[in-house]
């Protein structure tokens, strides 16, 4: 149950969209995969030769898997992640002063905001510097838990678990790696 993330979650989507849209899909995606595995196992295990064997009720399976497996484990993982430093808040993005000044170049613009070009058509660059950085915030720990447990690919931040707010310590990294394998190992 992996999915491709072709967007930067921290800048593209609101907290509400991340929570109600993507998190629900992360739970349903994982529950669907597990329910299909259950149906397949029931189909192989059926001893009924008259063609009337049942592989179960998909909606009952989805509900039970979500309520009795995914939600409790995700809750425990989210509490652990928050305790280890994964952010879980609804704060606005924070602008902080950096330790050292960052120097960079940017295109020089005319009065209309269009980039100026030199004789060869290349943009004219000007030196700039900054001493501030904007840090994204948000309810990350709760979404990180189901992302890892359900082996879903899309994270809160574009860098996923490589971002220090999603994976701040080696211990959280270990638990995230183990949580990816928890359900597949339990189903085998």
Name each model feature, range by range.
Residues 1-22, 88-177:
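P-loop potassium selectivity filter motif centered on the GYG triad
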């Amino acid at each position: 149950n992996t999915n491709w993330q072709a967007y930067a979650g921290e800048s593209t989507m609101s907290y509400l969209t991340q929570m109600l849209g993507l998190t629900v899909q992360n739970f349903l995606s994982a529950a669907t995969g597990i329910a299909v595995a259950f149906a397949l196992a029931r189909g192989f295990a059926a001893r009924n030769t008259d063609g009337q064997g049942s592989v179960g009720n998909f909606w009952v399976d989805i509900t039970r898997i979500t309520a009795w497996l995914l939600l409790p484990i995700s809750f425990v993982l989210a509490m652990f992640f928050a305790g280890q430093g994964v952010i879980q808040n609804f704060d606005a993005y924070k602008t902080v002063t950096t330790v050292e000044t960052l120097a960079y170049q940017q295109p020089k613009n005319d009065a209309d905001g269009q980039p100026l070009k030199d004789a060869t058509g290349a943009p004219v660059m000007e030196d700039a510097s900054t001493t501030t950085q904007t840090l994204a915030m948000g309810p990350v720990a709760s979404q990180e838990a189901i992302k890892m447990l359900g082996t879903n690919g899309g994270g809160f931040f574009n860098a996923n678990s490589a971002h220090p707010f999603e994976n701040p310590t080696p211990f959280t990294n270990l638990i995230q790696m183990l949580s990816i394998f928890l359900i597949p190992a339990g189903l085998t």
